[in-house]
Amino acid sequence: AKQMNTDILSKDKDPMGAAILDYQKSGKAGRLRVLSSMFEEDEMPVKHLFRKVEEMPMLEQKALKLAKGKVLDVGAGAGCHALALQKECSTKDASAKQENASEKQDISSVKAIDISPLSCEAMRLRGVKDAECINLFDDHLETGFDTILLLMNGTGIAGKIEHLPTLFNRLKALLNKGGQILIDSSDLKYIYENEDGSFDINLNGAYYGEVDYQMIYKDIKGDSFDWLYVDFPLLKSIAETCGLHGELVAEGEHYDYLARIF
């Protein structure tokens, strides 16, 4: 199996983390620029990373509703998903009124991880109780999760299609028996679609969902990184090669979808 990188980011190469921490501390941030060899320069609205549940896309809200047990939020960023789930944690407080308890989701704990030390600092400031700056592929990461969440294009972490089995096998190793992975992605095919409905895709080239990004914030330049978008049929078939089932939970408005892998 491919050896995945187990590093965390250094603070001087963590533009997104710097933007998140600025926004957390001052309520505003500069432009978080997103560059790619494949697309025009774009920017990521930092405020969006601090979205409340009601501001989240339907697919993310759906994923949060399906979470149960001991939860791991991978690539948690500013912690919006972890915070939302933390509120749902079944309180151990006996004085909590019983009628309230039935409405609560059965979530026992929430752990957020990110390779950005600055993002983890921001999450702790926001009240995420367990935010650890650790790489998903680091052996020191605890195991035994009932739900692993990978949202905002969770397949991205694999980087390339050939690494997706490595990602799935790693997640599988972190799951309890009966556990589930909730992951979202998009089919990028639409980018290559012509007016007549045909597609400009080189079938002998790299998989069309493989892209690269580089982020810049103020004078902080991140390293360029590979990011993977996967269509659902391919995600499902790769999950099956790893001895997992893939289920399409819901589709969004823009070729995006939420999948449950178990």
Where do the protein language model's features map onto the residues?
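N-terminal auxiliary segments of SAM/dcSAM-dependent transferases
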Residues: 2-35
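Conserved alpha-helix/loop element of class I SAM-dependent methyltransferases that forms part
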Residues: 51-70
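Conserved SAM-binding loop of SAM-dependent methyltransferases across substrates and taxa
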Residues: 78-89, 102-106
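Conserved SAM/SAH-binding beta-strand->alpha-helix loop
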Residues: 116-117
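A short SAM/SAH-binding and catalytic strip from SAM-dependent methyltransferases
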Residues: 145-165
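A short glycine-rich, Lys/Arg-flanked "PGG" loop and its adjoining helix->strand segment in the class I
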Residues: 164-177
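SAM-dependent methyltransferase
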Residues: 177-234
